[in-house]
Amino acid sequence: MLRKKTDGFSLPLQKGPFQNNGATPWFCELNIGTPGQTLKFCFDTGSNFNWVTSSLCSDDGCQHYANGRFMFSESSTFEWIDQTGTTVDFGPWGSMEVEEGRDKLCMPIQKELDACLFISLYLSKKYSGIQFDELDWDGGIGLPSGEVSEVPLDKLSGTFRLAQSHEGEPTHSHFLLDLMDKGFVSKKRPFISFLSDMSEDKSARGTVSFGLLDDAYSTSLEYLFLPWARYREEVPYLWSSENASISVGDNLIGEDLYFTLDSGSSAFKGDKTVLKKVFEQTTETSPVVSISLTDSAGDEYGLLEITSDVYRRDIEEGQHKGQSVSQFQWLKGAEDMLLVGSVLMDHLYTVYEYEEPSDGQLVPKGVWIFNKPGGSKIIQTKQKEPASLFDKLKAK
């Protein structure tokens, strides 16, 4: 167990085959339970709960590509919280029947040294569907913006990955806040970042960092800051920014959208009317898709240009294997949403930033995105000064 306080740490990410289910192929191998059982977890900024495929599932149930499950009865540190059972919404994927428990999760943050937390999480006992079949990981760790919905449980949206208690409280404590409370991450460094190396797909590697920043981007002028804005009262935990529009070539397709970066997803998803049109216009031809971001005064502060080599992906396993598919998917009930995950994030350095914690709470500040040196020039806007994000490190 790591005892010395640290500024932060990084964890290696591995990439599974790209599948057409809308979920990221990236995962981190973590140990859960005592003795530790190694399973594949996604660090998911598009959900507000923790979960794992478990031995509650029948022998032929909970089929998924990663094919791991937590054998909770073999862990001496596992504790039940609630065995009455509940249903967790996975949006268009359907739902998952779960029970709730608590156990030790250990992360390899240094050679031969682990950081361990006791976390609450849902143990799945039933799920089904083609999307789950194609899932490259065994469970997820939610990294929400920190906002909590005040909408009654029975009024919550069925479009996004979310869970909430009947009292309107967060179902599970915030993972980053837990890391801070244990001294694994400095409270002066309230950020989470994702960076992947796609130079050789077969050996693709990535990194998720808590409290640490990549200094290679400290002098970059090719970046944007996307200030956080609440998409809907019932799903305030999403990392969204308002006033986005999307065009295909010179054709404006949708405006007044909430642009959301979701590390648990892969494809562009959202508003049915908008995303259906974008998909149709990018399937047979290869136009540039552009996303414009404007401030409250209507002035553009950011422009992204996404070429077909970014938005069209070769499907490596599962349904449509061997095909090249435009990664724009529409969701029922996701009006005014433009969400994207690894399809775009693989080409950017992405940092989720909070305000410094106060009274045991985390408040979202926004998301920083940077072009990779030598990579695709997705961000067309060039800034006059380097990102102020790095001032936190200089002030230390």
Model-flagged regions — what are they?
Residues 292-396:
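Aspartic protease catalytic domain
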Residues 1-21, 111-252, 366:
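Aspartyl protease catalytic domain
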Residues 36, 111-114, 199-205, 296-301, ...:
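Short, solvent-exposed loop/turn segments that connect beta-strands within catalytic domains
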Residues 26-77, 105, 140-144, 158-161, ...:
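Aspartyl protease active-site motif detector
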Residues 283-291:
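Loop/turn-rich, solvent-exposed surfaces of beta-rich toroidal or solenoidal domains
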Residues 1-38, 86-99, 130, 216-255, ...:
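Pepsin-like aspartyl protease folds
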Residues 48, 57, 126, 146-148, ...:
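Conserved beta-strand elements of beta-rich interaction domains across eukaryotes
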Residues 20-136, 290, 295, 299:
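Signature of the N-terminal lobe/flap region of pepsin-like aspartyl proteases
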